[in-house]
């Protein structure tokens, strides 16, 4: 089946974007609002194709998205050439860049995503392959000169999910993203970077109620700022026992980040700058949990009411 959609929407500027107040929380990148901002208008076209073969248990999905925005709310960046006192408590330092939201036309975005699913009968599993391409054209102003940031993202992935039994379940997955950024007037901001995620999940349950869960992930980043090109493992594990009547009770011991390598790295690419951020995240911890399942809660009263009618 094929489906086509058209959608239109508006986006009003936020209160922060409209306030004519200087924010110096980041002294290198101070910002100020713009009370003259207009709302933007976005037009979207969406195309979807779906094919399934129930007999062979295969499927194929294709999605295409195209978007254009008028009066796009973007950023203008201005270099501070000398120390400037806005007030007794606010001083813009020489070398900083002041950012201000403005309206510009010329924003475009296109995205495609494809998925193929098929069975792996020899190992009682299903295989899903996916791939996609994303393009975005973002206008901006740098020292009153219009800059266009062209961003390209290419991604591929694969997932093998088992369908063996209720006692054995595993999932193996891999995804890779390659990104490239090209700017019209700031070639020093042009950049290529790559990241991938590989994971393995295993769930085992015995007929006597013992359970084991394993979740292992590897994440790698390349092409980021020095110090951000990381390669680390995140390993979570749990063991437990189901007990009581009908195995309604469960006692489980879990450990998060067994190798103490958990990290959080992100990249923000805008029309005026590229920023790499590493945040503090929760490190290794252990957790003991008890769970009791309340099955058919209230069913006795409902059955009695039906019998009396």
Predicted regions and their residues:
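Exposed, low-structure sequence patches enriched in small/polar residues
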Residues: 1-309
